[in-house]
Every structure is written in C-alpha cells, then in structure tokens.
Regions:
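Rossmann-fold NAD(P)-binding glycine/threonine-rich loop
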Residues: 85-96, 103-143
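Rossmann-like NAD(P)H-binding beta-loop-alpha module
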Residues: 120-201, 208
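A short hydrophobic/small-residue beta-strand
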Residues: 100-101, 377
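A conserved regulatory-domain signal marking ACT and ACT-like small-molecule sensing domains
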Residues: 310, 315-429
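Substrate-binding/catalytic subdomain of NAD(P)-dependent oxidoreductase enzymes
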Residues: 178-277, 282-284
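N-terminal glycine-/serine-/threonine-rich beta1-alpha1-beta2 phosphate-ribose binding loop
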Residues: 1-95
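Low-complexity, glycine/alanine/valine/leucine- and proline-rich hydrophobic stretches
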Residues: 265-290, 304-305, 371, 376-387
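Glycine-rich phosphate/pyrophosphate-binding beta-alpha loops
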Residues: 293-295, 299-305
Length: 429
C-alpha cells in the first residue's frame, strides 16, 4: 500500500489535534482512503517548548522550510497563522508541486486570488475546509454538493465568540463588557478578542464563502463589516419586544443583476428564523440554491477537534489526488457574476434606537429628516418607565439603501433633541 508523507507547519492547538487524531484513527483512515498517511516532518517555533503530544524528535524542526523541502513529504499542512510567512510557504510548496492544506482564513481572504492563480498554473490543489466553520463541511458542500445550483443567498453565524457573548446578553440581560469577561473566563474568547468581536474573523470567512459561491475573489475593502461592541442589553431587550434576536450575521447574496452583496454586522433576526435559535459557541449556515432550496448546516465552528476533523478530511482528499492525479481543484473563477455591490447601495430594513428629550415634537423632527431621504417608518416603540429627561425612542425602518439611511442618521444625530450616539442595526430579510 502506498504511503504518503505529511508535513505539519505548526503544532499549536489545531496542529496538536491533527497529529493526535492521525495517530488515533490511522487504521480507519487507511481503510477508507486506501492509502497510508504518515507524518514525516513537523515545524515548530520552539523545539524545547512543552507539548501535549510527543512526536519523535527526529522529525521536529524549527524551520518551516524543512517541511516543504523534505522529499519524503507529499502534502504540506499550514497551521502557522498570520499572512506573510504562510504566503511564502504556499508559494514554495505549490512550486514544488505539493498540495497545501490550511485553516488560515485571514491569509485566504487577503491573498486568495494570488494563491489560487498560482495553484491553477502549476495544477496543484489547495484545500481549506478548516478555514470556515470548523468541522462543518461547508467548503466541500459549496464546491461540490451545490455545483449545479445558482446560490441565491447564504446567511450565517460564523463566529462562536460573538455568538456566545450575544447569547449571554440575551439570557442574562447583561451588557457587552460583562458578557465578554464571562466568555474569556470560560475559555470562549481570547485574551485579545478584537477580531472576534469587531466582525473581521467572520468577515474573512464570508469572503471565502462568497468567492467560492460567485466565482470571483472578493476584495475585503468592499465588504461592510461591523462588530458587536456597541450592542447593549437595552437593544437586546427592545429587539425581543419587537419579535427579534440580535446575532452577528454574515449576509452573502446575489441580486437580479448578478451583483453580489457581502457584509457582516449585528442583525435583528426574526425569532421564528432558524438562526435565532443558534446559541452559545455554535455556528450555523443557511444556504439557498435555485434548485436545492434551503439547506441548513450547524455545528461547532472552532476548537481543536472540529478544526482537526476538517484538516484530516482535506488530507484524505489530497492523498487521493496524489494517488490518482487529474485536474487540481481549489477555486475556479468564472464570469457569471459581476462585482460586489458598494456598501451604500445595500438595501435592508433597519432598527434605529435614539436617546431623545422627553418632550412633544421630537418624533416629528426625526420623521421629517427620514422623510426628506424617502425613508419610511414601519413601527415605533417608546418604552415607558423612564424618569430621566432623556428617553429611548426605537424606530423600525422600511427597506432603504444603506447610504441614504446613513446620511439621514448623521443629520438626526445633529438635532438638539438627540442625546448620545444613535444605534443603527440591520434587519434580516
């Protein structure tokens, strides 16, 4: 039976899970794939650091180049993180005609076009199931399972940390700082949670999904990204009273002109929608195709074992490609869809919360500004029980282009009767 050598660049949390799982399920993999997979080289940052697994010292190195250049390594697994160094690894490995597996969403979001152009030139596959939604096989599903569908939309919860925080804010009525502190104490948020809570972790994943779905590599500068830091317990409560839950949602969809919308932002999700019931650290994706209709994917989107599972799935596919040859696959560009819609042209309903003076005429001033921008109010709540001179005013806005809505909010903010910054959230449609 043919043996195929694996090189791991990185032995951190995910790398450790991959190495352990390969040892644990080696016989199962061999029987299912018909090939024997063997780790032959591992690159680590510090050779003397303590580890939860103990590979043979002879296969360890503190230089990633030894993984790529080893003639006994046929598949390279990039688990280093970052952009510049992994990009260099990709170039070197692909030019050596070695398939590369990665879970590096930031790298693919920023350098995907260049990576896949090189991969196509040398006819070597790139695998990246672990880059989006952990153990949920969404990449394979879009690339293969839905290959005969025009994908009309993807709505997804793609970041477990932000979803945990919003879930705790909903369940316990606490504000963002307290929920974040709880997430960190329970190991669901990093010491530096910036990319999780500012929306960019989910945005990197959304860029990858949109690029696969629509056949052109999406420029991150054209993606609207907003985090959850400004969402308050009051917004959670008001949204609930209106029949919604607030989630950080990635919205990816094509319009009738074949233009593509890609955004990530806190979104009011109707309580009856399936995404509204996705709580804690779980991820979920609802994919709508013109033939298949609605499909739902749900599971753990991060963590050692779910991510390792995705990497091992890719290892099996890479080994089969080496054994059988054929055309490499990864990302196939095409011209069926034209461009990303500019942010200001994106259309949605909106939730607008203002803090205003408690006196007659305030609503008329706000509605007047909205009206001058051809923006309509669908409903309004003004919660009672506030003794202060300033009170909350919550407006639900009919569908409108974001550019017009943003301009109107800037004008409303300058009214003397408005106290504090307005809160504007999108509504799932």
């Amino acid at each position: 039976m043919q043996k195929i050598g694996i090189g791991l660049a990185g032995l951190g949390t995910v790398g450790t899970g991959v190495y352990r799982s390969l040892l644990q399920n080696n016989l199962l993999l061999t029987e299912r794939v018909g090939l024997e997979l063997e780790v032959r080289r591992i690159a680590v940052r510090n050779l003397s650091a303590p580890r939860k697994v103990q590979p043979p010292p002879a296969i360890l190195s503190d230089r990633w180049e030894t993984v790529v250049d080893d003639p006994n390594v046929g598949i390279v697994v990039e688990l280093i993180g970052g952009i510049d160094l992994p990009y260099e690894l990709f170039q070197r490995a692909l030019k050596a005609r070695k398939p590369v597996i990665t879970g590096n969403k930031a790298l693919l979001a920023e350098k995907g076009a260049e990576i896949f152009e090189l991969a196509a030139d040398v006819n070597v596959p790139v695998f990246f199931e672990a880059a989006v939604a952990g153990g949920i096989p969404i990449i394979k599903s879009i690339r293969e399972g839905f290959i005969g569908n025009h994908l009309q939309s993807i709505h997804a919860i793609l970041n477990g940390t932000s979803n945990y925080i919003l879930s705790r804010m909903t369940e316990a009525g606490i504000d963002f700082p307290e929920a974040l502190q709880e997430a960190q104490a329970n190991g669901y948020a990093e010491a530096d949670p910036t990319l999780d809570v500012n929306g960019w972790d989910a945005a990197h994943k959304a860029i990858i999904l949109a690029s696969l779905a629509y056949g052109f590599w999406v420029d991150s500068r054209l993606v609207y990204v907003e985090g959850i830091e400004h969402v308050s317990a009051a917004d959670i409560r008001f949204a609930h009273d209106l029949g919604y839950r607030i989630k950080l949602v990635a919205t990816i969809r094509a319009d009738s002109n074949s233009s593509v919308e890609v955004r990530v932002n806190p979104t009011l999700v109707p309580q009856g929608h399936v995404l509204a019931s996705v709580n804690g650290v779980f991820n979920a994706l609802m994919v709508r195709g013109d033939i298949v209709g609605d499909t739902l994917f749900y599971g753990r989107g991060a963590g050692q074992d779910p991510t390792a599972s995705a990497v091992i799935s890719d290892l099996a596919q890479a080994a089969i490609w080496i054994d059988s040859g054929g055309k490499a696959f990864g990302f196939t560009p095409h011209g069926l869809y034209g461009k990303c819609l500019p942010t200001d042209e994106l259309v949605s309903g909106f939730y607008l919360r203002l803090t205003v003076d408690d006196r007659p005429g305030v609503l008329a001033q706000v509605a007047g500004i909205l009206g001058t921008h051809d923006i309509g109010i669908s409903s309004m709540i003004q919660p009672e029980g506030h003794d202060a001179a300033a009170v909350p005013l919550v407006l639900m806005i009919h569908n409108a282009p974001f550019g017009r809505m943003r301009t109107a909010v800037e004008e409303i903010k300058r009214l003397a009767c408005v106290k504090g910054p307005p809160i504007l959230l999108w509504i799932l449609s």
